[in-house]
Amino acid sequence: MNTFSVSRLALALAFGVTLTACSSTPPDQIPSDQTAPGTSSRPILSANEAQNFVAAHYFSSLTPNTAPWTPSAITLPAQPDFVVGPAGTPGVTHTTIQAAVDAAITQRSSKRLYIAIMPGEYQGTVYIPAAPGSLTLYGTGENAIDVKIGQAIDGEMSTTDWRRSVNPGGKYMPGKPAWYMFDNCQSKRGASIGVMCSAVVWSQNDGLQLQNLTIENNLGDSVDAGNHPAVALRTDGDKVQINKVNILGRQNTFFVTNSGVQNRLQNDRQPRTLVTNSYIEGDVDMVSGRGAVVFDNTDFRVVNSRTQQEAYVFAPATLSNIYYGFLATNSRFTAAGDGVAQLGRSLDVDANTNGQVVIRD
């Protein structure tokens, strides 16, 4: 049986939302029995309250008198700036994604640059640094699964093991654009690398666009049911767009932070992200972190093959001085196997955070 419930006061349901479990009737054909104000464990927004929780408000700027971000659909050029694929293939400029990213960042261009990725499996991390211009990475296959970026990284691994795993052959070296990101993590003095350095794809690029890709932390069920952060995608930049992307993992699958180049969380910055037409899979705190994130027409899938403990879809750490955290619209929530899948819990790591999620429509 697949059961969804709400943990703590982390999540509010907007008027008219439908959640189902153990039913053969299609979800869109079941009338909602949710009415405001709901209960202390399942707060429900009234129609008037729900009017405030729309994408335009999530994409507003923290800077006074600045217009909100109004993202438009991702458009692709007839000819990309860089092409990643097998050596010797006509048009290919690089055989690894990281090499193409490094080449793009090295140009120090203020315009958007496009990296096309041919179908195939690309093992290894991809670090996308902060830069004057924005990058678009997109798969050229028919489906998102045709381009797979993956590696197994456990946040509980030692710094030494992590260094050996993510930097074979000196992929990250002094003088290369992403060196500062690698160096911030390899310089950690703790017993383990931690969630902040466990990502397969990590971006600090403002305006980053990802489309038609699969990003997976391959750690999967190779570890026990304990604490094993294993981020597939981490984004720190503002105005990030993710469309038709599969984000796969277990714990902390998709991690949104507001960290600066020193890899430290900030209390005065709110990155904005739009996720559309995508698929996210995991178990514990599968979507977590700071920032304003709008999910539209996205599928969330909870899996319990690694742990039978309660799973959580959302774990926001919204800054307490900001009204908007995560918003899911026109989206679907499913779970595999038996057990309880919580829609969310607040990841209030300190006095500056008060997690907020709204699921509606």
Name the predicted role of every residue range.
Residues 2-10:
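Bacterial N-terminal signal peptides that target proteins for export
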Residues 30-361:
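Sequence-level preference for short, compositionally simple segments enriched
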Residues 12-14:
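Intrinsically disordered, low-complexity serine/proline/glycine/threonine-rich regulatory regions
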Residues 23-25:
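Bacterial signal peptide processing site
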